[in-house]
Amino acid sequence: MSEFLPFSRPAMGVEELAAVKEVLESGWITTGPKNQALEQAFCQLTGNQHAIAVSSATAGMHITLMALKIGKGDEVITPSLTWVSTLNMISLLGATPVMVDVDRDTLMVTPEAIESAITPRTKAIIPVHYAGAPADIDAIRAIGERYGIAVIEDAAHAVGTYYKGRHIGAKGTAIFSFHAIKNITCAEGGLIVTDNENLARQLRMLKFHGLGVDAYDRQTWGRAPQAEVLTPGYKYNLTDINAAIALTQLVKLEHLNTRRREIAQQYQQALAALPFQPLSLPAWPHVHAWHLFIIRVDEQRCGISRDALMEALKERGIGTGLHFRAAHTQKYYRERFPTLSLPNTEWNSERICSLPLFPDMTTADADHVITALQQLAGQ
């Protein structure tokens, strides 16, 4: 236990090394057959019709908003308690992010908060499946259908998350992340699933310069026909090196998430006797992927502030995370929306702390965290 226990560590093994070696020796290392296999695997996992692999979930959000023609004068509803890339992409396209509050105990954006924020300018709704649990997506999607507004699910935390018996992303449009701390990772990467064929076609163009084909298609066809720009696009394709790692991780998903679940249960049992408050679980039927294990550290209740707790854990060789600092409290958005008040978001943003949670953690590692929390409670 002398080594520092990080907040997260990717679970990499000989299988990932072998997958990378195979790609390196194949003669084709950029976007190619491994991308195609990854996309097919995600269609099988989710049950959706189309999958588009991209260089990051942020890239996926960017081109999805672009494909939906989100721009100047439009509004997009999203929680403030999310990673800032969503707000940034909305803003960079000239649209206005309309930040709404979340449930105080699940941190999920609610259908009621979404519906109350709709105006004639609303073009999209971006709910977040938070920490590995699902938002009430049926109710949110029903609002989108009623008002004719697109719903883009932020599923960055939700590889392996199920809602009412179906994997997140089973219908509609959802964006997953393969960042280094996610449930499956390839260092950097993302993937969009959708049941909209026209949207899928636009996304494939936008992710690769606006061309009608990608580099692998061009090589396979002997560069005939010559590719041409159909619409201005970006360089957001995923390499086959990354895709091969993600595919290997996907095979291990059930094992990886089972281990996360075991650690989460160990935390839950110990926290029942401590003042630190874990998140509540959603009321609807679901399978939690346990991307994060979050506690709320209320100084009056716990005898220690969140920041002091994080520092004290660090001194004991334990890393933590903060998911997330509310976007509307950060400089750019604070100055842009100076009167915005989101009480539940703000209360949680000042108190949330993510404990170490990753598949290679041992029971002794989790016990080390629990012992430290027991020592610090009431200080």
From Swiss-Prot:
E.C. code: 2.6.1.87
Residues recorded as bearing N6-(pyridoxal phosphate)lysine in the entry: K182
Pathway this chain belongs to: Nucleotide-sugar biosynthesis; UDP-4-deoxy-4-formamido-beta-L-arabinose biosynthesis; UDP-4-deoxy-4-formamido-beta-L-arabinose from UDP-alpha-D-glucuronate: step 2/3; Bacterial outer membrane biogenesis; lipopolysaccharide biosynthesis
Highest taxon listed in the record's lineage: Bacteria
Catalytic function, reaction form: UDP-4-amino-4-deoxy-beta-L-arabinose + 2-oxoglutarate = UDP-beta-L-threo-pentopyranos-4-ulose + L-glutamate
Keywords: Aminotransferase, Antibiotic resistance, Lipid A biosynthesis, Lipid biosynthesis, Lipid metabolism, Lipopolysaccharide biosynthesis, Pyridoxal phosphate, Transferase
Cited SUPFAM superfamilies: PLP-dependent transferases
Database matches in InterPro entries: ArnB_NH2Trfase (IPR022850), DegT/StrS_aminotransferase (IPR000653), PyrdxlP-dep_Trfase (IPR015424), PyrdxlP-dep_Trfase_major (IPR015421), PyrdxlP-dep_Trfase_small (IPR015422)
Pfam families linked to this entry: DegT_DnrJ_EryC1
Enzyme class: transferase
Cofactor: pyridoxal 5'-phosphate
Cellular-component GO terms for this entry: membrane
GO biological process terms held by the UniProt record: lipid A biosynthetic process; lipopolysaccharide biosynthetic process; response to antibiotic
Sample GO molecular function, one term: UDP-4-amino-4-deoxy-L-arabinose aminotransferase
NCBIfam families according to UniProt: PRK11658.1
Assembly and binders: Homodimer.
Task of the protein: Catalyzes the conversion of UDP-4-keto-arabinose (UDP-Ara4O) to UDP-4-amino-4-deoxy-L-arabinose (UDP-L-Ara4N). The modified arabinose is attached to lipid A and is required for resistance to polymyxin and cationic antimicrobial peptides.
Similarity comment: family membership: Belongs to the DegT/DnrJ/EryC1 family. ArnB subfamily.
Name this polypeptide is given: UDP-4-amino-4-deoxy-L-arabinose--oxoglutarate aminotransferase
Organism: Escherichia coli O9:H4 (strain HS)
Gene behind this protein: arnB
